[in-house]
């Protein structure tokens, strides 16, 4: 049984993320979506909110588990007995960072492979950062996120005082 981990902050989870989950879950016996508690990135949504969002969007996949984690990815991978780390590459600009991370992960976890996947064409330009910015400025994000995620974004922006002018 091959277990893979797809780590990320998923802040918020986009249609691009779901596209990779759908495709990766058809390759591996179990796909663990690891929602990182990355304080360095100063997330828009709390870890608890991101876990709820991910479960709402991904809960219908029978072989996908959504779990939060803190600390090193290597420890999360080991805890889940994963043999593969799945990473998404949207553009060439993502490659340099992801290549360095894959090298470090190989050093820390020599028996674990990193698999890069590119999103489907219609999702290659989507990033959580861009989606958050559009939402905070009052723009339409419905083509980039699922309706439940759009609702979370709308409520969060409203709680912060509404869209910036």
Curated annotation (Swiss-Prot):
Its cofactor is Mg(2+). The keyword Nucleotide-binding applies. One of its GO terms (cellular component) is cytoplasm. Coiled coil: none annotated. One of its GO terms (molecular function) is pantetheine-phosphate adenylyltransferase activity. One of its GO terms (biological process) is coenzyme A biosynthetic process. The keyword Nucleotide-binding applies. Homohexamer. This is Phosphopantetheine adenylyltransferase. It comes from Burkholderia multivorans (strain ATCC 17616 / 249). The gene is coaD.
């Amino acid at each position: 049984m091959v277990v893979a981990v797809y780590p990320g902050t998923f802040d918020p989870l986009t249609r691009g993320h779901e596209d990779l989950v759908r495709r990766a879950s058809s390759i591996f016996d179990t796909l663990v979506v690891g929602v990182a508690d990355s304080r360095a990135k100063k997330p828009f949504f709390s870890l608890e909110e991101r876990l709820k969002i991910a479960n709402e969007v991904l809960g219908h996949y029978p072989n996908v588990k959504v779990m939060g984690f803190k600390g090193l990815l290597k420890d999360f991978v080991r805890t889940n007995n994963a043999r593969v780390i799945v990473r998404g590459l949207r553009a060439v600009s993502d490659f340099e960072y992801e290549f360095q991370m894959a090298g470090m992960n190989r050093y820390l976890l020599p028996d674990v492979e990193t698999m890069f996947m590119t999103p489907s064409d219609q999702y290659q330009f989507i990033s959580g950062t861009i989606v958050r910015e559009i939402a905070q400025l009052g723009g339409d994000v419905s083509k980039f996120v699922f309706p439940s995620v759009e609702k979370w974004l709308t409520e969060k922006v409203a709680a912060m005082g509404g869209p910036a002018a």
